[in-house]
């Protein structure tokens, strides 16, 4: 498929042939869902923790005698039946991550790129270079109509562009190796440089 290549000032800079195997697939929500779940689960801290009966700070002394009080039989105040007692089978620190094959992760990335292309939310620019001035880049981004955009560059991100983009709300930038399904789908517009297209085609073939 062919797509116009533009410069950051909005002028046309030719066109580019995009690989149908990466940008021309029929997007499948089930594949995208599985990859996003894998990403988010791996990112989850899993630090949830409650105190069990053995960890609560109370005496283990029997609170009153076994018989003759008319009350129920009780031992330690740490029992889960008491207020502020230990929690029975509560959450403990653990990893929420699970495995997903490299082949499936690549497939998910191809479907994410195809989803953006099909929705008309894919833009290819000649390069992502700037002199480091936020105001100038913010004006260009506003003129291009990018409100929530992810810019993916080649193997390395241009330092001046990264510095200029750092304080622009809704604009993220990643190198090609950092491209992932969650960040692509999270933003309204996916912006690829020509170097990013080449790197992604080499990585995902």
UniProtKB/Swiss-Prot annotation:
GO biological process: translation
Gene3D superfamilies, per database record: 3.40.1370.10
One Gene Ontology term, aspect cellular component: ribonucleoprotein complex
The protein, known as: Large ribosomal subunit protein uL4
InterPro entries in the cross-refs: Ribosomal_uL4 (IPR002136), Ribosomal_uL4-like (IPR013005), Ribosomal_uL4_dom_sf (IPR023574)
Keywords: Ribonucleoprotein, Ribosomal protein, RNA-binding, rRNA-binding
SUPFAM superfamilies: Ribosomal protein L4 (SSF52166)
Main function: One of the primary rRNA binding proteins, this protein initially binds near the 5'-end of the 23S rRNA. It is important during the early stages of 50S assembly. It makes multiple contacts with different domains of the 23S rRNA in the assembled 50S subunit and ribosome.
Record-stated family: Belongs to the universal ribosomal protein uL4 family.
Example of a GO MF term: rRNA binding
Region (Disordered): 65-99
Entry annotated with the keyword RNA-binding: yes
């Amino acid at each position: 498929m062919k797509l116009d290549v533009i410069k950051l000032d909005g002028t046309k800079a030719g066109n580019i042939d995009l690989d149908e195997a990466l940008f021309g697939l029929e997007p499948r929500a089930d594949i995208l869902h599985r990859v996003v779940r894998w990403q988010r689960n791996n990112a989850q801290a899993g630090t949830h923790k409650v105190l069990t009966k053995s960890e609560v700070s109370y005496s283990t002394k029997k609170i009153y005698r076994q018989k003759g009080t008319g009350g129920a039989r009780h031992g330690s105040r740490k029992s889960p039946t008491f207020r502020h007692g230990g929690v029975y089978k509560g959450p403990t620190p653990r990893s929420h991550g699970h495995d997903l094959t490299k082949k499936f992760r690549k497939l998910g990335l191809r479907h994410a790129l195809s989803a953006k292309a099909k929705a008309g939310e894919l833009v290819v620019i000649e390069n992502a270079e700037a002199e480091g001035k936020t105001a100038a880049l913010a004006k260009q981004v506003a003129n291009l109509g990018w409100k929530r955009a992810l810019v993916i560059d080649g193997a390395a991100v241009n330092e001046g562009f990264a510095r200029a983009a750092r304080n622009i709300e809704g604009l993220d930038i990643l190198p090609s190796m950092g491209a992932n399904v969650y960040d692509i789908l999270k933003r309204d517009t996916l912006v690829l440089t020509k170097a990013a297209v080449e790197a992604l085609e080499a990585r995902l073939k």
